[in-house]
């Protein structure tokens, strides 16, 4: 019985490793009722770009009522941002319709 439970735990952990941050981001946005639209071309372009030497990350901030708690990444201020680590340049931002136009320069927090 103990070995079966260990196998189940290892299998669940392996499944968590295969879920990408982008999918988690998309599921989070769908739960909020926001429309998430992505074409196969956009998905393929991001996958092709991520095969280079740079590591891709995804950033999902906590949606707080005050805009000051959202972070700037590169030159983008958005709900989800995928960027390279060297240099930190935003590759893709998920648009948010409720975010007003903001200045192009980030503020120091």
Curated annotation (Swiss-Prot):
**Glycoprotein: present as a keyword of the record?**
no
Annotated compartments: Symbiosome, Peribacteroid membrane
What is the residue range of the signal peptide feature? 1-25
Coiled-coil portions: none
Main location class: membrane
Q: Name one GO cellular component term.
A: peribacteroid membrane
Do the record's keywords include 4Fe-4S? no
Q: Name one GO biological process term.
A: nodulation
Q: Per UniProt, which keywords does this protein have?
A: Membrane, Nodulation, Signal
Instruction: Kindly summarize what the UniProt induction comment says about this protein's expression.
Output: During nodulation in legume roots after Rhizobium infection.
Q: Which domain of life is it from?
A: Eukaryota
Regarding protein family, the annotation reads: Belongs to the GRP family.
Name by which UniProt lists this protein: Nodulin-16
């Amino acid at each position: 019985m103990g070995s079966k439970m260990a196998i189940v735990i290892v299998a669940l952990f392996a499944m968590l490793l295969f879920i990408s941050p982008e999918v988690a981001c998309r599921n989070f946005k769908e739960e909020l009722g926001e429309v998430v639209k992505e074409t196969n071309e956009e998905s393929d372009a991001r996958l092709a770009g991520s095969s280079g030497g740079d590591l891709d990350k995804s950033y999902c901030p906590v949606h707080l009522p005050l805009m000051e708690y959202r972070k700037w990444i590169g030159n983008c201020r958005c709900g989800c941002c995928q960027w390279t680590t060297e240099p930190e340049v935003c590759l893709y931002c998920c648009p948010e319709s409720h975010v007003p136009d903001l200045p192009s320069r980030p503020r120091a927090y």
